[in-house]
Amino acid sequence: YPEYNIGGEAWMNYTIGSAYWQKGSRLNFGQDTELKSVMDFRLMGIASKAFHEETGYSGGLHTIFEHMCYDYVYPDIYNVLRFLENHDTDRFLPSMPKSVDDLYAFKQGVTFLLTIPGIPQLYYGQELLMNGTKEKGDGYIRLDVPGGWPGDKVNQFEASGRSEVQNDAWNFLRTLLKWRKGNDIIAKGKMKHFMVNQ
């Protein structure tokens, strides 16, 4: 306080629906919500597939490109909360990568998230490659980070308690976050769209 901000979890699977709820939106016909930040659930929904599949005219990174073309409908894109996963959804990674060479989806996803306009949100455990789907229930995607409680056999808060793949992901994300923190052009810069020419 006084810079306190509340994010609105208006779970809309389309950009215009989310933009409607943001403060200053012209889409809600003068009934301003005064809600400074809204969440980009549409991005989260398409990112979970886009970074894991082949890019073509109607799939993969092309869906991300199309989604980003609608940033202009938000009154303030820099106050849109963007994320790849959260406590109510499948994890971004459906399963644990088997080797460092299998980290391409993770690295592309977090790099994208941390270099686009908006407020990036990382869900706990993302840096440790926590993975899974809601098929087994919400508890499965909300597991404790090993090492946080007495009696835990593994401590993933220490490098020695993480696998080689987890340490690679941890170090990559740590480096990326430090780089972003020192670069206003990345954290607060503008995005320009170009036509895709395949």
Give the predicted meaning of each segment:
Residues 3-7, 79-82, 120-121:
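Structural preference for beta-strand elements that scaffold enzyme active sites
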Residues 9-11, 84-87, 124-128:
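Active-site-proximal beta-strand/loop segments in catalytic clefts of secreted hydrolases
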Residues 178, 193-198:
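Carbohydrate-binding surface patches
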Residues 1-75, 102-103, 112, 129-175, ...:
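Active-site-proximal helices and loops of the catalytic beta/alpha 8
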Residues 75-100:
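Active-site clefts of carbohydrate-active enzymes
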Residues 181-193:
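Surface-exposed helix-capping loop/turn segments at secondary-structure junctions
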Residues 114-126, 165:
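C-terminal substrate/ligand-recognition segments
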Residues 108:
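Conserved interdomain hinge at the start of the Helicase C-terminal
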